[in-house]
Amino acid sequence: MHQLSTSICLCFVISSPYVYLVSIACVLWTSIPFTSGMMDHSAMHHSGMDMDHGHGDMDMGGQCNMNMLFTWSTKDLCIVFSQWHITGPFSLLMSLIVIVLLTAGYEGVRQATRKYEAAQAQRLNVFSTTTATIARLKPSLTNGVQGNEFADESATTNVPSSQTPNESSPLVAGRDNRRAVEQRGKIILAALYAVQVFYSFFIMLLFMTYNGFVMLAVAVGAFAGYLVFGDNQSAAKTVACH
């Protein structure tokens, strides 16, 4: 129909003396069906988009629900990661048990750090005691060698300098060993400190879910961890990020 109207209009324009006016009328006439078709197509397109949006809205269910206020609701609760998604009572119960164990494990890491610090201090104390003992005995050993009337003077002069009492190596070796032990201990303590910082911030993220069940699980884990790993340590430690 649109093509037929266009042909009729062209023929009329060629035969009409009022070419300008007739051409305008033909353009308007032939454009009406095309515009209508465009409107129909646009309406269909928008309708399709609305349908797509409708389907998208239907697929929005099951995503993580991030709470910024205290709540007891566990619907679509995600803990730290989107993969850690609470989907029902069983997953909630298992997650709370895991949180209790994780929080108790933090106290275990702190206990391991305290024990290593004590052992490191004991090792360094042994080095200090040994070095002091050698330093006290060195003058007496030197005087004993010099006052020995049976010592062969020629043998004494032929002893290598590295083996003479005045230039013996126990003190130097002790200092070198102490330095190595200190450096190794410092690296291990730094690693343990980094683990504690990471662990404590992870627990902070657990608490920042603002979910009452998760908060209670963190508190129960801290309670259990102190009972198991406390070792009569002071319970007055202030809670901080690390």
Swiss-Prot record:
GO cellular component: membrane
Annotated function: Transporter that is probably involved in the transport of copper, even if it does not act as a major copper transporter.
Gene Ontology MF terms: copper ion transmembrane transporter activity
PANTHER family in the cross-refs: COPPER TRANSPORT PROTEIN, SOLUTE CARRIER FAMILY 31 COPPER TRANSPORTERS
UniProt source species: Aspergillus fumigatus (strain ATCC MYA-4609 / CBS 101355 / FGSC A1100 / Af293)
Annotated region (Disordered), positions in chain: 153-175
Protein name: Copper transport protein B
Biased composition (Polar residues): 154-169
Keyword presence, Transferase: no
Subcellular location: Membrane
Family label: Belongs to the copper transporter (Ctr) (TC 1.A.56) family. SLC31A subfamily.
Membrane topology: Multi-pass membrane protein
Transmembrane segments: 8-28, 86-106, 187-207, 210-230
Keywords: Copper, Copper transport, Ion transport, Membrane, Transmembrane, Transmembrane helix, Transport
Pfam families: Ctr
